[in-house]
Amino acid sequence: MRLRLIAVGSRMPRWVEEGWQEYVKRLPAELSLELVEIPLNTRGKNADVARLIRQEGEAMLARVQPGERVVTLEVEGRLWSTEQLARELDRWRLDARTVNLMVGGPEGLAPEVCARSEQRWSLSPLTLPHPLVRILVGEQIYRAWTVLSGHPYHK
């Protein structure tokens, strides 16, 4: 099974990379979790933010192949318990398509990305810093896998 986290933003602090890698390395070989970073466009005082978001969205969608699943991470998405995420992960595995988890920039996701989405997932009703979202997604995917495999990590 192949999961891809496509996230706007690059040049994250070392602790973010280390946190992400900690959970990626724990996953079994049959569950691949890849990070694809989309550069954040420069936001100046007079920037056309709508245009920048659209460009970031185009770059995100360019990484998605036809037929692949798109899941957007949005505050307005569905909140899943660990067990619900484990069920989704199992469905995704049975579906046998690459799953792209999309995380937008500071202003969110482009409408085109949301329109392509098959599912909307919310980690929390709180506004979370994007670097932390990467680690949370990695940990939650790992935790969901442990539920499915009967591993004692999730008790």
From Swiss-Prot:
Specifically methylates the pseudouridine at position 1915 (m3Psi1915) in 23S rRNA. Its main location: cytoplasm. Keywords: Cytoplasm, Methyltransferase, rRNA processing, S-adenosyl-L-methionine, Transferase. GO terms for molecular function: rRNA (pseudouridine-N3-)-methyltransferase activity. It comes from Pseudomonas aeruginosa (strain UCBPP-PA14). Homodimer. S-adenosyl-L-methionine binds at residues 73, 104, 123-128. Its EC number is 2.1.1.177. This is Ribosomal RNA large subunit methyltransferase H. It is found in: Cytoplasm. InterPro entries: Alpha/beta_knot_MTases, RlmH-like, tRNA_m1G_MTases_N. It comes from the Bacteria. Belongs to the RNA methyltransferase RlmH family. It is an enzyme of class 2 (transferase). It catalyses: pseudouridine(1915) in 23S rRNA + S-adenosyl-L-methionine = N(3)-methylpseudouridine(1915) in 23S rRNA + S-adenosyl-L-homocysteine + H(+). GO terms for cellular component: cytoplasm.
